[in-house]
């Protein structure tokens, strides 16, 4: 049997100086499965403690009623999915949830708001929330949509650590998934976030009827961001009745693991997070993802409005795999 050796260009220095063409990334996807996982595991061990997992908790602080038409999203006002609209929550309620998350081992508290982008009056409330959560000693992350000029600086001044702004899918597949914004709109906000000095959390979703080449295009687009994102969430589509993608073709589990491995190889210093879709993954599949370089999960029974594995189940799985929550001491 011929073993294919992956040529990893200088382990992709950070910030990004190596251009990853779609063809180059597609070639990684086509590497024999176990060889690909092995190579990704080697890259992982050069930059991270392979026995630790970074735990984040995600809370929806403003739910439903979004004017966007993202085909995967149950929070769009255009679809009938049963999601109950909820205005921006009060500071006290959010802080209480953040305290619970910290007590259960989360090191980062992520907050999501379902809108196209915040208005100036929303930013005033959000900065108050960020300051209160930071006072608990947690890292903070926000996903608030497209930002106007100056907003990223206000969030940074309030103490926000990370801004999540996913590019969703490959540029070539974008219009098949979203019609109310362009791929460049996402890049524009990412540029504002970087300019303000915030860390970037940026990933995408697989299983949206894209081709393997389009999955390669997603990873190439992420890997070519300069600098590369500090955090890369890889989501498996959660199919929700009422959304246009409710009947999307099922993605084979090995293809998802390949995506994790390719993300790890092309972005060696980024945290690669198992995000939405874990509820439908077996323990064995998740273990393979960790082997392939995933080193972060969303921890808690809910991801915005979709179900996530229960914390007890995650603790049991981590114990089986001899994995520990990441801390400053064991990084």
From Swiss-Prot:
GO molecular function, one term: iron ion binding
Keywords, comma-separated and alphabetical: 2Fe-2S, 4Fe-4S, Biotin biosynthesis, Iron, Iron-sulfur, Metal-binding, S-adenosyl-L-methionine, Transferase
Catalysed reactions, semicolon-separated: (4R,5S)-dethiobiotin + (sulfur carrier)-SH + 2 reduced [2Fe-2S]-[ferredoxin] + 2 S-adenosyl-L-methionine = (sulfur carrier)-H + biotin + 2 5'-deoxyadenosine + 2 L-methionine + 2 oxidized [2Fe-2S]-[ferredoxin]
Chain residues that bind [4Fe-4S] cluster: 66, 70, 73
Assembly mode: Homodimer.
Functional description taken from the UniProt entry: Catalyzes the conversion of dethiobiotin (DTB) to biotin by the insertion of a sulfur atom into dethiobiotin via a radical-based mechanism.
Protein name: Biotin synthase
Organism listed in the record: Histophilus somni (strain 129Pt) (Haemophilus somnus)
Lineage, opening ranks: Bacteria, Pseudomonadati, Pseudomonadota, Gammaproteobacteria, Pasteurellales
